[in-house]
Design a protein with these regions (language model features):
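Flexible, glycine/threonine-enriched loop-and-boundary segments that flank and lead into catalytic domains
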Residues: 23, 29, 33-59, 114
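Flexible loop/turn segments at secondary-structure boundaries
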Residues: 15, 46-51, 70-73, 132-135
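PAPS-dependent sulfotransferases, especially Golgi type II membrane carbohydrate sulfotransferases
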Residues: 1-18, 24, 28-31, 76-197
């Protein structure tokens, strides 16, 4: 719902992040084996309030996987369109494209703004092309940046997981950028500053 998203974007999310931190603390309290372990929060939604998330989770490392928006925007729109259509037949691909094109642009701009004002050591950058070339090395770099000891067993476990979860073994994600009312040129123009970095 666009009006809800617009409202949410104006609200202070600090209490929500404090509540989230408390939930994780409760999880660790309930299961002593989790104590002292790192948490991984994976969602691009954190980009809309990254400054707040970093304030509440003061020792968090932000891992940013950089991929060309020409690929990610239509892919994300396709995923969202699939999710939306589960709940409504009135939602069109073009409606999803219009909404998420703007939202992803806002998130990216927000990320770049927060990044420019934050200590460099809070961030770990991973180029998607490098991740595809050598996922174990990239995983090792991320873990080391997060202060996690990378033992030979960890490297072996990563390699085994990657071997068991090959991208080629999954069905391809098929979509056409024009289905969402978008074009490569539109994306290149909207994300020009991000794509230059």
């Amino acid at each position: 719902v666009r009006s809800y998203a617009a409202w949410l974007g104006t609200e202070d999310s600090e209490q929500a992040y404090k509540d989230l931190r408390e939930i994780y603390q409760a999880f660790m309290w309930q299961d002593p084996s989790r104590q002292g372990k790192k948490w991984v929060l994976k969602t691009p939604g954190h980009l809309m309030a990254l400054d707040t998330a970093m304030k509440v989770f003061q020792d968090a490392k932000i891992v940013m996987t950089h991929r060309d928006p020409v690929s990610t925007v239509p892919s994300y729109c396709s995923m969202e369109s699939t999710l939306y259509r589960m709940g409504s037949e009135d939602i069109t691909h073009v409606m999803v494209g219009e909404y998420w094109f703007e939202r992803l642009s806002q998130w990216t701009d927000s990320f770049m703004s927060v990044r420019s004002k934050s200590p460099e050591e809070r961030f770990v950058d991973v180029k998607y092309t490098e991740l595809l070339k050598d996922p174990v090395v990239q995983g090792q770099l991320v873990l080391e940046a997060a202060g996690i000891d990378v033992t030979p067993d960890v490297i072996e476990d990563m390699g085994e997981w990657i071997e068991a979860n090959k991208r080629e073994d999954r069905a391809p994600h098929k979509y056409d950028i024009s289905d969402f009312g978008l074009s490569e040129d539109m994306i290149k123009e909207k994300f020009a500053v991000y794509r230059q970095n």
